[in-house]
Amino acid sequence: MKTTDIKLVHTDTLSCEPIVRRMSDGSLIMVSQCGDTYEPAPNNRVYFFHSYDDGESWSTPTLLYPEDGNAVYCTEVALYGGRVKAYLTLHNGQFFDWRSMVMCSDDCGHTWTCEGAFAGLESYAFIRGKLELKNGDILLPFQRYPVSEYENLRLLAEFGGVRRPDGRVLAVCDVPDINIDHVDNGVMLSRDGGKSFEKFSCPRFPIRGETGLKWIWSEPTLAELSDGRIAMLIRVKNETLWRSESCDGGKTWSAFKPADIPNPSCKPKLIGLPDGRTALIHSANSQKRNPLCLWISDDDMKSWKTREVISDFPLNFDYPDGFYENGKLYISIELQRRDVLFIKYSL
């Protein structure tokens, strides 16, 4: 019998992109951006929560990155044996002066130390959900915006602290004359368990100019298919997800094409299942982030025969993440950018 168990982890003035993972001691950790009333904003910070009863109850929020005046965002929490790494973004509150930062924990996420910037993706980049391939290779998908240091300084000088008519700070995606014309998506590939990485990029995804795209938050997610191919999905705009594939373990990628998967410009999450099927957690709607859906493919993402609604509660479900374990999906999600939810959904 299918069951859906939904628990409230935390409510804040803003909650954004919670990420749940199983720790080596059996506990669960949830990491989420919280604080301020929108994002990006100067008072965005990243907190963690623990659960020792499989998600029935959660600890109070604890700051993950030590306070230094920077706005902070987290885009991935990855396990490497008993070590946990949180991939953070530090910025001025507008995604200017945007720098990567890796935080590491060897005690299941209770204390954290700073490892510095992620080599090769030091600035204007998000690191996304880790995928370990059947051969042991590790892939970290990324999105990167080719903003030079000169352009970064110009943005700070001209637009730092500038506010929009609605009172919110002007974000990097709002700048009309930013000097970039594409977004880089790709993977960081490790063959030594995550000790070192090499960067491999997809064909550039053009923005601005004749594309009609002012900016995209691509937020790539990966799945390994039955024949060893790797599929990547990205969000582009309110219509459909886009797809690229690699046939050589992530070194080269096909050009992105529409995937015929409706999406309201919201992060999707692919999860490989032990039986070879591929699960996709997303909002299967081209206009709004509702309902929260689970699609499952048994033919390497050619079709999605299983299409289920996890919840159609009439508010926005934003930025799903999670993992599979013992017949259930462990899902983290934000509701209406305020509530951090934890969901156990049986398959």
Region roles according to the model:
Residues 1-347:
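Asp-box/BNR beta-propeller blade signature and adjacent active/binding-site loops
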